[in-house]
């Protein structure tokens, strides 16, 4: 019965466009921001990734900072960070999922955040295009570039997305070098960082990374450890008992000599 009621409510909210009804985010890094009612109402009701949100708030005064949000989904963290950097800062949000990107841009416009720059692409170690796995649900938070050896379900229509290299965007002046980077890209963080190695070396931003695979863990450490970063676990996001995969970590650079 509960599933039936959920489907009926879902259909009603979408057909009447009440899913776009404006609400306010109640708590967390984006507290007070304008938001849309449905879906993913936990974003505005509160209780979503509380540990990670506390770390974002704990960054303190980030006025004027540049922040990158890799895997922004609907933009909860992008909006929250942009409200804190203010117009002298810049927040760059990467979201290749077209459904999620549309909602991200809606939330940007609802809050008048002209210094939040949404980019409808994934980031990787080389520019190009790639197949994006959705498993028939573009509203999921787990749509992703393929994991190593993963093959697409033949029943799901393929979606192709752009791939961009972060160092190229910085070199061209399209985006600023970051003070902070949040990464939740479903197993692709090591490739995203490989495409930003020059910027990481020069700018030495603070990073928060959500790990989803052992390959991703090893790849990220292979990039950040030689740069003098140290990692601290801040949250478990999948009930994982593994030491690192399935957890969120904050990476801080060692002080410059």
Predicted regions and their residues:
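Cap/insert and terminal regions of metallo-dependent hydrolase folds
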Residues: 206-212
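Core alpha/beta nucleotide-donor-binding catalytic domains of modification enzymes
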Residues: 98-101, 105-137
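Conserved SAM-binding loop
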Residues: 93-96, 185, 209
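S-adenosyl-L-methionine
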Residues: 1-114, 173, 238, 242-257
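Conserved S-adenosyl-L-methionine
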Residues: 119-121, 229-238
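Short internal loop-to-helix segment that lines adenine-nucleotide cofactor pockets
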Residues: 45-68, 113, 117, 129-131, ...
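Short glycine-dipeptide loop
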Residues: 87-88, 202-206
């Amino acid at each position: 019965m509960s599933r039936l009621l959920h489907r009926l409510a879902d259909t009603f909210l979408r057909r009447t466009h009440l899913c776009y009804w404006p609400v306010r985010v109640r708590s967390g890094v984006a507290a007070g921001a304008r938001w849309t009612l449905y879906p993913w109402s936990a974003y505005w009701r509160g209780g979503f990734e509380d540990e990670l949100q506390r770390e974002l708030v704990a960054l303190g005064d980030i006025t004027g900072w540049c922040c990158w949000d890799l895997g922004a989904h609907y933009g909860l963290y992008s909006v929250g960070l942009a409200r804190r950097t203010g117009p002298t800062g810049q927040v760059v949000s990467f979201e290749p999922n077209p459904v999620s990107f549309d909602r991200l841009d809606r939330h940007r416009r609802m809050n008048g955040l002209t210094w939040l720059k949404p980019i409808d692409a994934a980031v990787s170690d080389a520019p190009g295009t790639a197949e994006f796995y959705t498993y028939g649900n573009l509203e999921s938070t787990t749509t992703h570039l393929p994991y190593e050896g993963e093959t697409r379900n033949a029943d799901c229509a393929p979606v192709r997305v752009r791939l961009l290299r972060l160092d190229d965007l910085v070199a061209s002046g399209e985006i600023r070098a970051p003070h902070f980077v949040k990464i939740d890209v479903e197993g692709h963080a090591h490739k995203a960082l490989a495409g930003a190695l020059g910027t990481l070396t020069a700018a030495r931003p603070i990073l928060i990374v959500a790990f989803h695979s052992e390959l991703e863990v090893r790849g990220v450490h292979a990039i950040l450890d030689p740069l003098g970063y140290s990692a601290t676990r801040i949250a478990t996001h999948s009930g994982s008992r593994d030491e690192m995969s399935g957890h969120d970590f904050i990476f801080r650079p060692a002080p410059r000599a």
